[in-house]
């Protein structure tokens, strides 16, 4: 089972969504008559304004696998509350053996994140963020852990509603 790590490819479609292909793996299924080759693609899609989604597609040909992954990513999009091009607060995300730490950063810092995490932030439209991964560096697990962390983001309005206070009281 040879593994092909594809270069992250960016594409912007007519619907205004940014697409990035994170990886393409060649997979084999061994059967009585020999081997059957296939491909698995991992992609992320975002609108550059806080919406992001991840998709995984499998097929006998690379373009078909990528197409399936992009369609699935579009269906799985969700909104992340951003604050001035960065995150609301520091947060941890976990999936499988991958753990990620995501922290907001000051203007001018840029996206300090490795591989698959960088692709997620690029399609989301985050300009300043610091991210660190621990554990497994499997691209699928890293993307899922990053999305887990992003789902845990809460706005000051959310926290105020939970505590039964006003936003001004929360922000001090």
UniProtKB/Swiss-Prot annotation:
One of its GO terms (biological process) is translation. It comes from the Bacteria. One of its GO terms (molecular function) is structural constituent of ribosome. Residues 17-80 form the S5 DRBM domain. Gene3D superfamilies: 3.30.160.20, 3.30.230.10. Disulfide bonds: none annotated. InterPro entries: Ribosomal_Su5_D2-typ_SF, Ribosomal_uS5, Ribosomal_uS5_bac-type, Ribosomal_uS5_C, Ribosomal_uS5_N, Ribosomal_uS5_N_CS, Ribsml_uS5_D2-typ_fold_subgr. GO terms for cellular component: small ribosomal subunit. The keyword S-adenosyl-L-methionine does not apply. Keywords: Ribonucleoprotein, Ribosomal protein, RNA-binding, rRNA-binding. Belongs to the universal ribosomal protein uS5 family. Part of the 30S ribosomal subunit. Contacts proteins S4 and S8. With S4 and S12 plays an important role in translational accuracy. The N-terminal domain interacts with the head of the 30S subunit; the C-terminal domain interacts with the body and contacts protein S4. The interaction surface between S4 and S5 is involved in control of translational fidelity. HAMAP family: Ribosomal_uS5_B. This is Small ribosomal subunit protein uS5. It comes from Burkholderia thailandensis (strain ATCC 700388 / DSM 13276 / CCUG 48851 / CIP 106301 / E264).
